[in-house]
C-alpha cells in the first residue's frame, strides 16, 4: 500500500530547509577536515573523514530533495526509500572517524565496531528497498541501536579520547536519541521538523568531536 502524504506544504518546506543546513555544514567542515588530513598525510584520518562526509552528505542531500518534491511527484515515493537508507549511512559514516582514527589501535574494538556499523548500514539499505511500513518502530529502534553500539567500546573510547571529545559525542547521542523520539511522533504536526533540527544539532556536536579527534591524533 502506498504511503499517505500527511505533511503539509509548509511542513515540507521546513523539513527541506532544515536539512539543507546540513549540506552546508558538510561541505564547509568537510573541506576543512580533508585539507587538514591531507597536510598531515594521514591516510587513516582521510579515509575516516571521507566515509563520514559521504554518509552525512548522502543523508542530508536525499532528505533535502525528498522533502522539497511535490507530494504528487512520481519521484517522491522512490526517493523516500533512499531517504531511509541514507540514515543508516549517516550513522555508519559518523562512526568512521572514531573507529579508524581513535579506536584503530585499541585492539579489536575499532575494526570490530567499524565492520558492525557498516554491515548494519548495508543490511539497513537492503531493507529500505523492501515494502516499507510508515515510520516503523523497528526501524527507529535499529537507528537507536546502531547509535548506542559505541557503548560496547566505552572503556577503550575513554582511554583513546580526551574528555572534551567524549562530552561532544555524548551530547550528540542525546540529540539523536531525543530526535528519534520526535520521529516516532511523525503524525503530529511539525514533529518531523523538530526531528530534523535535533539531527542537525547532533551533526554539529559530531563535527566538534571530530575536530577534537583530529587535533589529538594529527
Model-derived regions: residue spans:
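Multi-pass alpha-helical transmembrane bundles in non-GPCR membrane proteins
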Residues: 1-218
